[in-house]
Design a protein with these regions (language model features):
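Basic, short loop/linker segments at the boundary and entry of helix-turn-helix/winged-helix-like folds
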Residues: 1-11
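DNA-recognition alpha helix
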Residues: 16-33
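Short amphipathic alpha-helical "interface-anchor" segments enriched in bulky aromatics
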Residues: 23-24, 215, 248-281, 319-365
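Major-groove recognition helix of helix-turn-helix-like DNA-binding domains
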Residues: 32-52
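Polybasic low-complexity intrinsically disordered regions
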Residues: 46, 50-211, 215-228, 239
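An internal, acidic/charged active-site-proximal segment
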Residues: 180-183, 187-293, 330
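Long, low-complexity, polar/charged, intrinsically disordered or flexibly structured peripheral segments
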Residues: 283-328
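Basic, amphipathic alpha-helical segments enriched in Lys/Arg and hydrophobic/aromatic residues
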Residues: 338-405
Length: 405
């Protein structure tokens, strides 16, 4: 049965009835699936409901055996951990985006006469918080619109290969308390990261150097968890820059020259000493670090130095002072920007799961069935990684059709 479900994903067939008809017409496909007779639709459905946890265990096993392959393909990208949240829209009556949009327009018309009236929160309060058919299907803001979906966190490496899937059931997030749709999503994202990664690291003893996440994960607790607890460098943009930066710093937490606040000091590495917290070392922007006779020296070219030191001003900033602003890799530096560009690979993975693997077109509203479909999509990707590795065709690991064609 599992072979048939993986084949169904590979062929981008969302409808089980259509897949059954194809199996009835093709003896070759029946042989691949190991069927002498084709199961009916209810047998497929019962399998997904009954064996959802077993499918997850199988997926976790595939994650373990594909990690060395990912490391062999590109060890640098395999040292990068990426997390994104998404939602699998269920086949429920409430999933009509026009309904919320119409309600929001009506509320915005009311707010014209009352500037303190929050149209977004009021519109959300009038919508059912969960689907009548299944309370696990909740009102969410996903993929640019409101819908009723099974919320999911996807974890990948820098290659876009799925490392974990987590179905969070966070009851502490109230979508009606958010002032905007994006704020509602960011609030959910910020609270989902630590539980998701705790589950992931409890199953896999993997080590990562960098974490990439969008601005939704910009929360102090997330920085502390990643850097202090997991020894992972977080690469996360600010959700919103401080309205008034700290004196002597710009909006990204970079110290400025005392004589010219438009002149940013230069990053010069991390200072680590036993018994002291890690510190970011910044040097004068007009000081050049060089090697002379085997020794490191600084050459200062400033005409109006702010210090008598021959190397110019040096500023050591403890990371613990403000772990969100004082990032190990300076925010918006060339290294930070190059790393963050890699984050878009998870968007490709989400797209692949929903469209080439037909997850977006499933007509399901049962929790276990929806979870099984998501897990099967991830299993299919990892099976393709194994096939591509055996075929020495790893450059196409994110293109299922190219690998199996």
């Amino acid at each position: 049965m599992i072979s048939a479900l993986i084949l169904k994903s590979m062929l981008s067939i969302a409808d089980t009835s259509l897949f059954i008809n194809i199996l009835n017409l093709s003896s070759e496909l029946r042989d691949i699936c190991g069927f002498t007779t084709v199961p009916n639709a209810s047998q497929f459905s019962r399998f997904k409901i009954k064996f959802e946890k077993d499918l997850k265990n199988f997926f976790d096993y595939l994650v373990e055996i594909t990690d060395p392959i990912c490391d062999e393909i590109n060890s640098y990208l395999n040292d990068i951990l990426i997390v994104d949240t998404t939602g699998i829209e269920a086949y429920v009556n409430e999933n009509n985006p026009k309904k919320f949009d119409t309600l929001l327009r009506q509320c915005k018309a009311l707010s014209k006469n009352n500037p303190t009236f929050n149209a977004h929160s009021f519109a959300c309060s009038k919508m059912p918080k969960v689907s009548y058919a299944n309370p696990d299907i909740k009102l969410s803001y996903m993929n640019g619109h409101y819908c009723y979906a099974l919320k999911t966190s996807i974890v990948t490496n820098g290659l876009g290969i799925i490392r974990d899937i987590d179905f969070l059931n966070d009851k502490s997030t109230n979508i009606t308390e958010a002032a905007t749709a994006s704020e509602a999503k960011d609030t959910y994202d910020s609270k989902s990261l630590i539980p998701t990664l705790n589950k992931f690291f409890s199953k896999h003893d993997f080590k990562y150097k960098y974490f990439l996440g969008d601005a939704g994960f910009d929360a102090v607790d997330n920085y502390k968890y990643l850097y202090k607890d997991k020894n992972i460098i977080p690469i996360i943009p600010l959700r919103r820059a401080p309205s008034s930066p700290m004196p002597g710093f710009n909006e990204n937490g970079v110290p400025t020259c005392p004589n010219d606040n438009k002149l940013l000091m230069k990053f010069d590495g991390i200072t680590r000493e036993k018994g002291r917290s890690d510190r970011i070392k910044w040097i004068c922007p007009k000081s050049k670090k060089t090697r002379i006779n085997g020794k490191t020296q600084y050459i200062l070219t400033c005409e109006n130095p702010c210090t008598t030191s021959k190397c110019g001003k040096i500023y050591q900033v403890p990371i613990d002072n403000n772990i969100r602003m004082h990032t190990v890799i300076p925010r918006n530096s060339s290294k930070w920007n190059n790393l963050y560009k890699t984050r878009t690979i998870i968007e490709r993975t989400n797209f692949m799961m929903k469209y080439p693997l037909a997850l977006q077109y499933t007509k399901l509203n049962n929790t276990e069935s929806l979870k099984s479909e998501v897990i099967l999509s991830a299993i299919t990707q990892l099976i393709v990684v194994l096939i591509a590795n055996n075929m020495n065709n790893t450059q196409n690991i994110l293109s299922i059709k190219k690998v199996i064609s």
